[in-house]
A protein has these predicted regions:
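Cyclophilin-like peptidyl-prolyl cis-trans isomerases
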Residues: 1-152
Length: 152
């Protein structure tokens, strides 16, 4: 669900209360939280860490996905099962976050860019590269149906 949520918001295929239908959610949003040497956080439609997409969903925290290196991408939340649109990227291992946040990605290239991001820097656009046949036919709304999203 977590990956499908991020892809759906990035591509504009998941309905939300912050953007018009079909509009890419993350384009133009800012990074509202930066903890030097630790994490950067973005994805808030209000730009201050208090916004959401109008729904929340459950945590997915398998023990195999950890905050064990720089570049881990995970959902930010305000408590268990309150995931929405906000995400963060780690700049170093932070094992204290394990089990409480849904890890769903890893930055593979450009880790140095993360360290240059400052509060207020904009996300110009998010591009999802669908490589391979299974990625090309992946249906976000089947993987993350509306019933899995609890309206706020």
């Amino acid at each position: 669900m977590t990956v499908a949520n991020f892809i759906g918001l990035a591509e504009g295929s998941i309905e939300n209360s912050a953007r018009e239908k079909g509009a890419p959610f993350y384009d133009g949003l800012n990074f509202h939280r930066v903890e030097a040497g630790a994490i950067i956080q973005g994805g808030c439609p209000l730009g201050n860490g208090l916004g959401n997409p109008g729904y929340k969903f459950k945590n997915e925290t398998p023990k195999s996905l950890n905050h064990d290196k720089a570049g881990v991408v995970a959902m930010a939340n305000s408590g268990r099962n309150t995931n929405g649109s906000q995400f963060y990227i780690t700049m170093r291992p932070i094992p204290s976050l394990d089990g409480d946040y849904s890890v769903f990605g890893q930055v593979e290239k450009g880790l140095g860019v993360i360290e240059m991001i400052e509060i207020g820097d904009k996300i110009v656009s998010v591009t999802i590269e669908r490589r391979g046949e299974s990625a090309k036919v992946f249906n976000v709304n089947e993987a993350f149906p509306a019933k899995a999203r609890k309206k706020l």
